[in-house]
Amino acid sequence: MSVILPESHPEHPFNLIPELCRRFYDLGWATGTGGGISIKMGDNYYVAPSGVQKERIKSNEIFVLNSSQDIVEKPRTDKQLKMSECTPLFFNAYRMRNAGACLHTHSVKCVLISLLCDREFRISHIEMLKGISNNETKKALGFRDTLIVPIIENTDFEKDLTASMAECMEKYPESCAVLVRRHGMYVWSDTWQKAKGAVECIDYLMGLAIQMKQLGLEWEPKDVK
């Protein structure tokens, strides 16, 4: 987010992060305090707190960090809040992809796909692919393109995923997402709008893929004209 918005603006991260957390909760992506959201504006990185009811986060409960991952402003509340455990992984996206936002979901569809696939989730010839961009070219995928989302193994603590996620991002420079087996997914993009659109499209495709699997349909059909 290149434009610096006043704190009263509905799209300022102080207001936007709680709104998106509520949306994610309603979708089943951030239940049980799970999931996370971070948005960059100017030189600051805004991060939701950890271990809280995501649908009840307030604008004064957001952490503000600098590019060195140092806290420059703590939440403006008396609550003893803890910064998101996802923070080092968000910064993978900021440092390696120059992202404007990074989203973390605990979607059931993502977890199921991580159990159905070995090292990658691949799907092609579905219209909703067009809502996802190639991370290198920044161009939207086409109907005949193949979406590839790599999968890394889960760890006991979120921070311990940092190195394996970074290694995976280096190996898959075109991908805007990484699946964590039995856990969830991280998605990033240049703006929060694009990141939101991408995670919605990928989640849709994963839900569709699960149903296709049940019907014996191929995720990468070879005979589609």
Curated annotation (Swiss-Prot):
Classification via SUPFAM superfamilies: AraD/HMP-PK domain-like
Active-site residue numbers: E127 (proton donor/acceptor)
Binding site for substrate: C86
Keyword field: Amino-acid biosynthesis, Cytoplasm, Lyase, Metal-binding, Methionine biosynthesis, Zinc
Uppermost EC category: lyase
Major subcellular site: cytoplasm
Pathway(s) of this molecule: Amino-acid biosynthesis; L-methionine biosynthesis via salvage pathway; L-methionine from S-methyl-5-thio-alpha-D-ribose 1-phosphate: step 2/6
Co-factor requirement: Zn(2+)
One GO BP annotation of this record: L-methionine salvage from methylthioadenosine
Enzyme Commission number, as recorded: 4.2.1.109
Localisation: Cytoplasm
Pfam families xref list: Aldolase_II (PF00596)
Cofactor binding note: Binds 1 zinc ion per subunit.
Keyword Zinc: yes
Described function: Catalyzes the dehydration of methylthioribulose-1-phosphate (MTRu-1-P) into 2,3-diketo-5-methylthiopentyl-1-phosphate (DK-MTP-1-P).
Family: Belongs to the aldolase class II family. MtnB subfamily.
Name by which UniProt lists this protein: Probable methylthioribulose-1-phosphate dehydratase
Organism: Leishmania braziliensis
